[in-house]
């Protein structure tokens, strides 16, 4: 079983990945943001580093999917390969932060990679409002995220909504997280578990 969690920056992907891995005894596959050599530079100069960052993420995400396909255990994944190509790169391109030449090159590489792997058994999308995202980002206090622009988050949210509505590659579950505090509230986490169990029947 491969379950993947998608959602904007600060939506709770990593937290839910950890909680589900602990609850079900699954292997977690986390997004490795702390060792990313481009992330801090990107937030300081998005236009200069956008292509480098997106290629780095695409490479790591493809390797993750290959590892998951070869794994003999159930895996819960924090962030999907789709989000890089369907959300982040197009958003950067539309904002003028990635050139058309780089974007077309990136899309071509993604199309090749995606033809070689299969989608997750269940895709969970964590839907969140911008105020909730901003609150969560400030709460966790990652230094490199302190300069995230609101218009950048808004653009991502719009693209997430468009993408998830059109997602037809496999089963999907949309969870509205603005009023769910699944880390602090066991009842909220139980609600999430029930939604997942119904979606995987």
Regions from the language model: what does each represent?
Residues 5:
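Hydrophobic anchor at the beta1->P-loop junction of P-loop NTPases
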């Amino acid at each position: 079983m491969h379950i993947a969690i998608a959602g904007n920056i600060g939506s709770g992907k990593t937290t839910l990945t950890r909680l589900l891995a602990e609850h079900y005894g699954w292997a977690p596959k986390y997004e490795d943001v702390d060792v990313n050599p481009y992330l801090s530079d990107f937030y300081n100069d998005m236009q200069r580093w956008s292509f480098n960052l997106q290629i780095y993420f695409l490479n790591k995400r493809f390797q993750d999917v290959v590892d998951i396909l070869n794994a003999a255990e159930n895996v819960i994944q924090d962030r999907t390969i789709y989000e890089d190509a369907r959300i982040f790169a197009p958003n950067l391109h539309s904002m003028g932060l990635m050139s058309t030449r780089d974007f077309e090159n990136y899309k071509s590489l993604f199309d090749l990679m995606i033809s070689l792997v299969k989608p997750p058994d269940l895709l969970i999308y964590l839907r969140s409002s911008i105020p909730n995202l901003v609150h969560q980002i400030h709460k966790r206090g990652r230094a490199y995220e302190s300069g995230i622009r609101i218009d950048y988050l808004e653009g991502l949210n719009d693209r997430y909504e468009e993408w998830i509505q059109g997602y037809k590659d496999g089963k999907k579950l949309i969870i509205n997280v603005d009023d769910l505090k699944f880390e602090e509230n066991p009842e909220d986490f139980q609600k999430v578990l029930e939604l997942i169990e119904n979606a995987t029947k």
